[in-house]
Amino acid sequence: TSYLMKFEKRIFNSISKYLNPLDIAATPEHLQYLPEELEYDFLLIGYDRIGYGIFRMLEKAKKSFLVIDFNPDIIRRLAGKKIPCIYGDIGDEEILERLDLCKTEFVVSTVPDVDDNKRIIKKIKKENPKARIFVTASVIEEALELYKEGADYVILPHFLGGERVSSLIEAVDKDPKKADIAKLAHIHDLRSRAELEHEHPRDV
């Protein structure tokens, strides 16, 4: 569950300062595939579930992209197919620092951690203000927070299915103005839901 994942993450963060920095930063070669002079239009953070649908859409559209995921089995499989990928937790500052986002047009995070997504938004806004940013939240309150931080769209999996997310990303990629329209409509909808107490309970 998302609660357990956050609990495990807090434990790791609390002990990481006692670990050898080289152990944290090192990424075994079989847990990444990074061709030389790699440039990617899309950065996909999180491959499972919604991320898989987005991945399929990017492949079909023949977009250049990089996948980041915390599941070593997924990264081994992608690396074996020579699909650009990195193993790691996007909440790890070292992973964020490795990313060159200057030419990235679109960043999609399917990781429903509000703090991680705030850091992602902050980094992208600093390095590449023109990039479109889609992030994920578990509840309406966090979604509205992420909009305030500058997200172009916040995915709420309980309200929006994976296929619709992929279709929206594809539409925005073709016409960036559609992101602004979708964002304003979504914020209005979320505020209405919040007033009616349609908030989805947190996973436990």
Residue ranges and their predicted role:
Residues T1-V204:
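Cytosolic regulatory regions of ion transport systems
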